Amino acid sequence: MNIKKSILFLCAGIFLISSLSCREGGHVAKSYNAGINIIPTPRSLEKREGSFKLSDGVSIGAITPEAKKIATYFAAKISLATGYDVKVEDKGEITLVLDSCATFSPEGYALDVESSRVQVTACSPRGLFYGMQSFLQLLPAEIESAGIVRDVDWEAPAANIIDSPRFAYRGIHMDPCRHFMTVEEVKKQIDVLSMFKINTIHWHLTDDQGWRIEIKQYPGLAEIGGRRIEGEGVEYGPFYYTQEEIKDIVSYAAERFITIIPELEIPGHELAAISAYPGLSCKGDPVTPRNIWGVEDIVMCPGKESVFTFLENVIDEMVALFPGTYFHIGGDECPKESWKSCPLCQKRILEEGIKPDGKHTSEQLLHTYVVERIGKYLARYDKKIIGWDEILEGKPDSTATIMSWRGDAGGISAALSGHDAIMSPGPNGLYLDYYQGDSKIEPIAIGGCSTLEKVYNYNPVPDTLVLIGKDHHIIGVQANNWSEYFYNNDIREYHMYPRSLALAEVAWTDAKRKNYVDFERRINNAYVRLDGHGVNYHIPLPEQPGGSCDHIAFTDSVSLEFTTSRPISLVYTLDGTEPGVSSEIYTSPLSFYQNGILKIASLLSSGKLSKVRTIQIEKQVLLPAVDVEGSFHGLNMEVTYGMFLNMQEFMKTGKSVDVSTDIKETGELTSFVPSTNSMRDVRQYAAVATGFIDIPENGVYFFSSDLEEVWVGGKLLVNNGGEVKRHSRNDRSIALEKGMHELKLVFLGHIIGGWPSNWNNGVVMLRKSDEKKFRKITSDMLWRKK
């Protein structure tokens, strides 16, 4: 094995020097604490000479009760990390001034740091809170530690900051319906998000997969709608928030100047509620909460007056818990097929004089009727409605605020129609359940790609609206955290951070003051602050250009190149040990001439490592082709009915065959029994296809598939056992001689992690090692015997 080591030790030395330096105080100064690290970037910042040093007995001066409350909050935070006795008095070295005459926006502040004093001035308690958050970000990142840190000089560089936000609405969406968040997990996010001046949490409390709020008049919502039976057969729940827990969380958020907006989905995405009270749907058939992802066809029936009575009663209880201005009513992804055949819905359309207008069907306008009627009811409580951009398909009242999620178009249409809009488009990076790196090695996600840079570079105000003077209708921006694939809170945080911090800067900082390169630098400081709160944030993984793979075959030699989604050091070992801060640093592609194990990880300036990738490198000889006589195009397939979660369960059946047939395409493995949107009453089965694959030329080939198993030449290449069958994350390569090779493909129809394997297309992909893209194995490559 020959490893290219050019400038390796020089780079290692530079890394160590840049990471560590000394101050006069004798404490080691961390590189991530250098410079100004405030997120989001302030509107105006002037650096000055000197610094303010915290010392034991420091006092925070505040006179009004509102200012004293904020002073007490930050005194506790400072004391927790420093161990200092931090007093709250009328006067102090740190002073909080509420000045009603100050020329600030309601959330604006001035922060003046000198060597002898610190003063925060604002016209509202909210402004004081944000000013103190900025002061804490001038201090070393360890100020957010959960315990005393003794080897830090607690100094803040002298500076003058004048600051206010770009947008009044700066939101993060959280979804406990698909996967629940405990009260403590919600509070943890509130603590962290408030550090970066996020002021709104959109709380998605109801959906097809779960109802998460106690409604006393309808106890079945929580007791029945709050639980589901997963595809694996286990019960999930019952999980929901009691009204007392809701009050506690809302109060906790308000103390940190975060408003919580509840979402009650209407009239679609409510299968959990319908499961508890079947009469809410058109047919009234008994159902259970959805245990798979996607859009449910069974929705509420707007033809029944009892549905509106139900919704109004639920709203009565919810508005008492959420004192904010807005109430989110959903309105998205509502299939209307059942309304077309429902006599009561058609009667409602007739009675209300609803008629198609050339742009909208009667059913779309019936949807608008629901939105308007609920909007009017909420107006009795002085609530303004927010709805997803589908509500524009009808004619919503002009007071409705549109949440544009399918792109900028919804926000543009809203503004042109006189509606305010909140920009939250998935295609533009604001769906944080998207991948943030190579899908081959990142945890399973819904799809898409939303890197930190993509989130950061989003501009919520389309140029079109600026040109016509309608940009004032864009009142804010929000990132969404749909939780289908957030199986626990660690995964949730892995997706939320640090991209939520990029969103915070998009929402607060004027576009002309944004600088992504500097943001990348400041993120290193923010990482340590997140460490203080125990946040499991994303660290970019070492990726192989063209698609990562942990099993590499070669015949003569192979060169492995690595990159990351943003600049970061990589360290590795070749002896099977785990890499660490003292391991060799990757500087150029690594060449291998014999078998080996490469362990490689990303290394932050704080010394924290990413997940370690273990890559098996194997020297192989070309697997000889086999002679096949009397063959036909296609594969032989055997089908066994039943649901098998894994190969062990399948093998226990003795593989009794119910159907023997032949197929022309690999996709027929997953389509033998048609799947449905709901997967109700679909007969599950396992299928094994055997035959041969015709390899066009000698070489090393990578195989990729979402099937359970892919065998080539008697070797198991792709093994997706026990995993969510999406995005083919277990690729493997093999050296093959030109010609025929045995092929076995295994499909198990089941639901794991909310995803039915039946929804996959059954395709098997391959690429030669010198090719950049995978290609589908086509029917002309498949052969079978009689």
Placement of each model-derived feature along the sequence:
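Short, compositionally stereotyped local motifs that mark structural "simplifiers"
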Residues: 39, 514, 520-648, 652-691, ...
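Feature activates predominantly on carbohydrate-active enzymes
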Residues: 103-326, 342, 373, 377, ...
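Flexible, acidic glycine-rich loops studded with aromatic residues
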Residues: 385-390, 395-400, 405-558, 565
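Bacterial Sec-dependent N-terminal signal peptides
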Residues: 1-34
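Contiguous, structured surface segment used for ligand recognition
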Residues: 23-167, 491, 507-517, 521, ...
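Active-site neighborhood of glycoside hydrolase catalytic domains
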Residues: 290-291, 295-398, 405-413
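Coil residues (strongly favoring Ser/Thr
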Residues: 79, 100, 115, 145, ...
